Amino acid sequence: LHEEYEKLYSDGRLKKGETFFNLIYKYADIYKSKILSPEINIRNESKANRYKVLSHIMRKYLPFSEWIPPLLAFYEKFYDDELLVDFLDKLEKKATIEWMAGFTSTERVTSFSRIIKLIDESDDSRDVIDRMLTYTSPEARERGRVIDYTKREELEKILDLTLNRKDFYKLKGRKMAKYILLRLDMEAWDLEGVIPQYTEVVTVEHILPQNPSPNSEWVRKFDEETRVEWVNKLGNLVLLSGNKNSRAANYDFRKKMEVYFSRKWTHFRLTPVSYTHLRAHETEADL
């Protein structure tokens, strides 16, 4: 780290002493005001709330932080709250797609560094947002892994291969399922008034249990092959507030709905939708 800073000093990109510490304080203030306790000064309440919720979900539930330096760099240069929301939307898309695509930490650093390079080169904040998914600097064009964001079929393939996996719940140490469910839940809010906080303990629950009792209705209605195929898929997962209840997790359908979902869904939009749908289709054929 010392060697890296010495390079920055020697080529004039940083100055030692008070100037350096002022720069640190400036970035610290941006980090606090736009990431830790985000405030967005724009008239559009829904858009401002979207930034607050999305930045919170990313900071708390993405298991990496390489997306943060580009956001700090963008705001430090342009100080535009309105466009910062648009920037974060695209930044989150990039972070999620490349996480699904299996980028390593080194590959993420290289990928997000390209955005910082673009910010350094551009004096137009809208230009940065328009080009941030496709930009590669001339010297880096042949270096590092790149996803072509202009090819819809490439993006759809990444999404399909990830979201439809039968072991989806277990991906990335079980972190991806929680993040994707929270993102889907966020999109179900109108964000005009009360906004989701997602500050309590968030649990991912299986509707069809992972380990149903041999004499349960789950075993009667789903053979082993079907259970293996569906139990860890995205469509079998819902969000709950609070810690897991291992006993309730294996209850039969009606009791599970009453004891588990109906008491713990209040902070989420999608869980009651799943509950209502399942109650409406509670038959031998559809359950």
Predicted features, each with a name:
Residues L1-K178:
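A cross-family structural signal marking well-folded subdomains
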Residues L133-T271:
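Betabetaalpha-Me/HNH-type nuclease active-site subdomain
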Residues T276-T283:
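Conserved small/polar residues in nucleotide/adenosyl-binding loops
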